């Protein structure tokens, strides 16, 4: 079995190493990912522009490739250029953050998996939901850091890929969207459907009360504060049962959502 692993957080992000470690006993692994963070970039593809490919090493010393492009670019380059044989499966992630609901169309992680499907390869998009109460910690000097605990994510991903290896990918779907909580009550994944949305979004400017907390970000060169706005977001807190959000956030268990790339709505017969 040959597996291509990519992500949108960048080739040196800890999640991509976790994904590799989860399945390296099951298949031959090739890692191809963007050279830097490309979160929320969706399915952008770089057409007719040069992309630089660099061979590099992950933290465990294993070989990987970085691409100066988007997550979808990395998948295309990996499948069509770097791999000798077409992979049997593409895994994208593990994303450092949640990817649920119909908002997944903006996710570089999920859209890289969608790109794999367009190339005729089944895929799994994997994300870690980090509970702010347990994932954000302080060191002995009082400095804050993020504790990326991929333990359960690696176990669930391993078991899922093992099932696919033994039984094949389900014929009726194109890809899986897997989200795993860092703070969990159950290790067993649940088959779910997409929630309507993940984020409540709001535009703020220098006149908003939230500006002191949310508007303090570095300016681009020669950029001034005047006429600047920022899109802020907060995680939706209420979800219907059997959705990915309810399973992940309320029930605190892994959510596995089967997806199809065909967005055709079959309900409309005549209009």
Summary of predicted features, one role per range:
Residues 3, 14-81, 85-86:
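A cross-family phosphate/adenosyl-ligand binding-site feature
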Residues 5-12, 103-104:
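Short, glycine-rich nucleotide/cofactor-binding loops
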Residues 9, 37, 70-71, 95-98, ...:
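Short glycine-rich anion-binding loops that position phosphate/pyrophosphate groups of nucleotides
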Residues 30-32, 65, 91, 122-126, ...:
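Hydrophobic/aromatic beta-strand patches that form the interior of the parallel beta-sheet core
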Residues 77, 85-139:
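Internal, conserved structured core segments that host functional sites
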Residues 118-166:
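Phosphate/ribose-phosphate-bearing ligand recognition and processing surfaces
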Residues 146-148, 167-271:
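C-terminal accessory domains and tails appended to enzymatic cores
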